[in-house]
Amino acid sequence: NLDAVDVDGAVNFAADVTYADGADIITASAGTSNFRAGVNAGNSIASGGNYNVAVGDEAGTAISTGDNSVAVGYAALSAVSSNSGNTAVGKDALRLTTGSQNTAIGHAAMELNVNGSYSVAIGDFALYNQNPATATNTYNVGIGKDAGISVTTGVQNTYVGGLAGDAVVDGTNNVGIGFEALSADHGSGETAVGVRALKVSVADNNTAVGLNALTANTTGASNVAVGKDALDANTTASYNVSVGAASLTDNTTGDHNTAIGSDSLANNTTAANNTAVGSSSLTANTTGASNTAVGRSALAANTTGSNHTAVGKDALLVSTAAGYNTAIGDSVLKANTTGNYNTGVGASALAANTTGDYNTVLGYQAGDSLTTSSGNVAIGYQALATETAYAENTAIGYQALKTNSGGYYNVAVGHEALLSNTTAQSNTGIGNDALRANTTGANNTAVGRLALTANTTANNNTAIGAEALDTNTTGGGNSAVGYAALYANTTASNNTAMGLNALKANTTGAGNV
């Protein structure tokens, strides 16, 4: 065993080992397994190079002629000749490579690597100015401290932490991942994952995922951002989509928006073709545009209007300042303010809409105490149940004009038709129980089934078919026309009847024909 040796001058111990004066162990060079250790370390290994390792001082000083390299300290792989496997570990690491399968690990890592190759660098200055202009294949990665420190000139990129893509020059397929992520990148495929994510991107096909996501991205492009502050004040917009947390947080300036959860279109500015899907959905979107919102608080106090559609939960929940509305389920136009071209559809439909306009509603509680009215039409179940404050009514099925209160140009079409409408006006009935015990009269017309079914309290009647003036009460201008015509009309007035049972046992008299 050789524990310690005091060498004065260079001494050759065997054909392949030299102790140099003032140096660490140095194996003889020339071919095959190679290992060297200090001062001029790999000092131009030749005879085909081979499995190299050189360790300190000027380390791989122009290894010739390549092979599986590793160099460890000081000037590490000092301008390798003729390429091969590279790996370098410290100080100036892959100092001016030129090329092949690189990996570098610390201090200046890929220090100004000449003509790239398959790259990876891990710490300190990481991909420190990698610079292909030919001989490329540069698949870059980065990993720590200054990670992609101004990659020149781009290619496949991936950076991981520290300042990640720190001022990338010049882009390509990027990914970012941590701390300042794609910090001032020069575009291309982009994707960044955490902390400052796409901080401050110089665009292309963005995607960012967490914390400040698209942090003030400039200038827009195809965006998607997923969490925390998502499209955090993205500038200047493009095709947005955002997914959670504060979603389109104060996005500036607009474009094709879509946001999906949490605060969704949270105060989006300045609008464009919105869609939002859940949680607080279009939360106080500013300023309007083509909206659609789908769940939870849907168009939650949208400001300022535009072409709405909302679909569930609180739907048009206190919309401000309206637009072409349509809402479809749950609380539908829930106390919409201020009106416009409304349409309802289900659950509580036009639930106390305020303030009116061209309404149309379809089911469940239909015109559910619509306020304050306008063009109305309602279609099913409780139809115009119980209208407030009147206007041009039309209702179509089941309880139709169910005790409409305040009347007006009424028409109702089926089943209970004008079911006890109050307080009348220009009525028309049409089917099933038609003017069923209408109250209080007016210019009536009813058409089929029980027609003027015990209309109360009369006015200018006309009936037409089925049981026609079926025990009309109380009189009026009467006319009847078919089937049971003036069927036991009570209590008379100016009668005329025409077919089948015409004045059928008319009671009690009056103008007859």
What are these regions (language model features)?
Residues 16-513:
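Glycine- and small/polar-enriched repetitive beta-structure motifs of secreted/surface proteins
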